[in-house]
């Protein structure tokens, strides 16, 4: 008998019919003898509807963060109560709790709170009594008793945090895909589902644009060594297990996956006086505006001037460009140029640690397709490049093939 935390997202509980299906799935596990804690999101689209209501009543002002948390947290209350009802109807004793009722204690950063502590006694008492415990994801309570929410993707984090607090055997994340793939199957039809991947690799892929799991949830799972499994909500299958283990084998590919991100933009400030502290003068104001910088390249100095290039999220390009224009005037740079038609492609794999020449193999594959590399960034288990956006899908397919990630052709194909 195992203790399992299961998390179902908004699509999985998007209607009464789907909640009934989730109840059937939970019952199967309960009938097999497992203890279950189930974490739910609000119905698909419900959080946005509640936010729109708050915006409508607030007019020209931003909704008050505290009150926004109060209204948004009601979405999960609906789904947890409905699932508890559906389970009891099936003869499965179940009880639902909000984040505050099970004392998911957070800081007071409304709309983006972080979990500090979980009091697991109430849940353990119910589990011991044979009940399935259904908990609202995405929310908690601060020391003053105020309702807080954890930000987008917070339900994944709730699931992992509960699994860590309860020392669960596994945290299962149910979604609309049947696991983690070597890359997006919509781009590469021969992408393969991974049976297993490390926390490190999953964290890199999540940070590079993979939408399967939220970064905070993966970080939490890695920190507390919570085995994560990504599964399809309504299809049977083993899914993908995410663990701390690195199993070396002769058959194991060097690269686990190809990640990509279309939401990149590039800014270059040219003719920058090459003096100590110039990087801070350029990036300090950008950071001060809470704009996250990704890749950075500084050219070799020529005539005591240099060019400085960095990438930001495309949504923040205009704000970053305005700041950079002001900086250019202040430091005496020649000009600012930008490009929003770029994309980032990355190869990820712990196998890089023990294999030389991985980056050159990547560059060779792109060169064969006449794809120019504009920027390069590396880490211990990742190599990222910036290219023209129009070549993105070609690059992903070429790299997927070059690193032997393509699924073998079925007989008769």
Curated annotation (Swiss-Prot):
Disulfide feature: none
MF (Gene Ontology): aspartate kinase activity; ATP binding
ACT domain span: 267-341, 347-413
GO (cellular component) term, any one: cytosol
GO BP terms, alphabetized: diaminopimelate biosynthetic process; homoserine biosynthetic process; lysine biosynthetic process via diaminopimelate; methionine biosynthetic process; threonine biosynthetic process
Primary location group: cytoplasm
PROSITE patterns named among the record's database cross-references: ACT, ASPARTOKINASE
InterPro entries on file: AceGlu_kinase-like_sf, ACT-like_dom_sf, ACT_Aspartokinase, ACT_dom, AKii-LysC-BS, Asp/Glu/Uridylate_kinase, Asp_kin_monofn, Asp_kinase
EC number: 2.7.2.4
Pathway stated in the Swiss-Prot or TrEMBL entry: Amino-acid biosynthesis; L-lysine biosynthesis via DAP pathway; (S)-tetrahydrodipicolinate from L-aspartate: step 1/4; Amino-acid biosynthesis; L-methionine biosynthesis via de novo pathway; L-homoserine from L-aspartate: step 1/3; Amino-acid biosynthesis; L-threonine biosynthesis; L-threonine from L-aspartate: step 1/5
Keywords, in A-Z order: Allosteric enzyme, Amino-acid biosynthesis, ATP-binding, Cytoplasm, Diaminopimelate biosynthesis, Kinase, Lysine biosynthesis, Methionine biosynthesis, Nucleotide-binding, Repeat, Threonine biosynthesis, Transferase
Catalytic reaction equation(s): L-aspartate + ATP = 4-phospho-L-aspartate + ADP
Oligomer status and interactors: Homotrimer. In the presence of inhibitory amino acids the Stokes radius of the protein increases, suggesting its oligomeric state may change.
Job of this protein: Involved in the biosynthesis of L-aspartate-beta-semialdehyde which is a central intermediate in the biosynthesis of different amino acids (L-lysine, L-methionine, L-threonine). Catalyzes the phosphorylation of the beta-carboxyl group of L-aspartate to yield 4-phospho-L-aspartate.
Entry's family note: Belongs to the aspartokinase family.
Protein name: Aspartate kinase
Organism per entry: Pseudomonas fluorescens (strain SBW25)
């Amino acid at each position: 008998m195992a203790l399992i935390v299961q998390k179902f997202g908004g699509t999985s509980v998007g209607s009464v019919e789907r909640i009934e299906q989730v109840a059937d799935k939970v019952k199967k596990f309960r009938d097999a003898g497992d203890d279950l804690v189930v974490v739910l999101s609000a119905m698909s689209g419900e959080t946005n509807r509640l936010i729109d209501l708050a915006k409508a009543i607030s007019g020209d002002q931003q909704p008050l963060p505290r009150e926004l948390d109060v209204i948004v947290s009601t979405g999960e209350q609906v789904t947890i109560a409905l699932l508890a009802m559906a389970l009891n109807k099936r003869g499965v004793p179940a009880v639902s709790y909000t984040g505050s009722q099970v004392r998911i204690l957070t800081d007071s950063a409304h709309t983006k709170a972080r979990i500090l502590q979980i009091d697991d006694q109430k849940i353990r008492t119910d589990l011991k009594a044979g009940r399935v415990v259904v908990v609202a994801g995405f929310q908690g309570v601060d020391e003053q008793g105020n309702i807080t929410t954890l930000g987008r993707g917070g339900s994944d984090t709730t699931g992992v945090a509960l699994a860590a607090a309860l020392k669960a055997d596994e945290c299962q994340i149910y979604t609309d895909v049947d696991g983690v793939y070597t890359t997006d199957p919509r781009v590469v039809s021969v992408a393969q589902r991974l049976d297993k991947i490390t926390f490190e690799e999953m964290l890199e892929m999540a940070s590079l644009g993979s939408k399967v799991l939220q970064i905070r949830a993966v970080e939490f799972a890695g920190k507390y060594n919570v085995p994560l499994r990504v599964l399809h909500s309504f299809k049977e299958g083993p899914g993908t297990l995410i663990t701390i283990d690195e199993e070396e084998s002769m058959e194991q590919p060097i690269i686990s996956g190809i990640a990509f991100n279309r939401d990149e933009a590039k800014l270059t400030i040219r003719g920058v006086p090459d003096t100590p502290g110039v990087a801070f003068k350029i990036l300090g104001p950008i950071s001060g505006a809470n704009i996250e910088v990704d890749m950075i390249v500084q050219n070799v100095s020529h005539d005591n001037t240099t060019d400085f290039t960095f990438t930001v999220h495309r949504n923040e390009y205009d704000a970053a460009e305005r700041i950079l224009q002001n900086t250019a005037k202040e430091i005496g740079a020649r000009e600012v140029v930008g490009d929003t038609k770029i994309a980032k492609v990355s190869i990820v794999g712990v196998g890089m640690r023990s294999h030389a020449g991985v980056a050159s193999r990547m560059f060779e594959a792109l060169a064969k397709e006449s794809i120019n590399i504009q920027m390069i960034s590396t880490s211990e288990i990742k190599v990222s490049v910036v290219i023209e956006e129009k070549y993105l899908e070609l690059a992903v397919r070429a790299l997927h093939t070059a690193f032997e990630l393509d699924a073998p052709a079925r007989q008769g194909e």
